[in-house]
Structures are given as C-alpha cells and as structure tokens.
C-alpha cells in the first residue's frame, strides 16, 4: 500500500514522494461467521501519540507555506485538498486519502474547497518508518 508524503531535502525544499507501507494478507475474523472470514491486506500497527479532528471553515481557502508541529498523517474526510510543494509541484488529494506531511524546511501550501473541509490528523512520533511492536 502506498501513501503520499511531502518531505524536505537537506536544502529545505519540499517535494512529493510515496511511502510504501508493507502489508500482509490475513484472515479478517477467523472466529466469526463464515461471511466475515475473508482475507484482507493489513499493515502492522504504527505508534500514534495524538489524534485530533479538524474542521476547516468555508472560505478558508489557502494556507501559505507551513509545516505541522510533528510527524503528522492527515486523512481527508470530504472534499478535495490541493497541496503545493516549494519546488512548484501541485497534487490534489481526494476524500478518503491520507498524506504524511513534512515537519521541516520550507513547508507546503494547502488549498481547501470553498465549502470547507473535515480531516483527522494523527501524530506519528516515528512516522511510518517503524511499526510498533
């Protein structure tokens, strides 16, 4: 499984990339009803220290270059957000998608839909580098 990420290079410029999240095919509910006993691909658990729910109000269209305070996974619940990195590349992220955002360097620009938007932000102290035990 892949997750979009925004990262900074040593010169501080931000860029897009992907994180490959390893998954394993496992039985979902082996002790449940036969209809619930299907196989699905699952990753290991990752340590999360905080979770918050965010509502971006209607009219809050653009957030200029910024970084979150820590390793953050943003999951968009509705609408579509547009990100721009300092190298000028622009990507759109639709509802249901997640982005691992940069924590240093020049940051990124976020552009939100005129009607507002909702997201969940999960602080991952170790990012997606190391699953928890």
What residues fall within each predicted segment?
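Tight coil/turn sites that cap or link beta-strands
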Residues: 56-61, 95-97, 104-105
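A short beta-strand-loop-beta hairpin characteristic of the jelly-roll/cupin
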Residues: 67, 73-94
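Short acidic-glycine-tyrosine-enriched beta hairpin
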Residues: 21-23, 86-103
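A short glycine-rich, His/Asp/Glu-containing loop-to-beta-strand
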Residues: 10-64, 117-122, 126-127
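Short beta-strand His + acidic residue motifs that chelate non-heme Fe in jelly-roll/DSBH
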Residues: 63-65, 83-84, 92, 101, ...
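Short acidic, Pro/Gly- and aromatic-enriched capping/linker segments at domain boundaries
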Residues: 1-8, 89
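A short hydrophobic beta-strand segment most commonly corresponding to one strand
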Residues: 98-103, 114-131
């Amino acid at each position: 499984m892949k997750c979009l990420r925004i990262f900074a290079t040593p010169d501080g410029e931000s860029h897009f990339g992907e994180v490959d999240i390893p998954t394993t095919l496992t039985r979902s509910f082996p002790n449940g009803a036969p209809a619930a006993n299907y196989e699905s691909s699952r990753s290991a658990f990752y340590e999360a220290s905080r979770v918050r729910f965010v509502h971006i109000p209607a009219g809050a269209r653009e957030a200029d270059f910024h970084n979150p305070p820590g390793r953050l996974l943003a999951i968009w619940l509705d609408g579509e957000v547009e990100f721009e990195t300092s190298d000028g590349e622009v990507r759109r992220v639709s509802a249901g998608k997640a982005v691992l955002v940069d924590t240093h360097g020049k940051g990124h620009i976020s552009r939100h839909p005129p009607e507002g938007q909702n997201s969940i932000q999960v602080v991952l102290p170790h990012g997606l580098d190391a699953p928890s035990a």
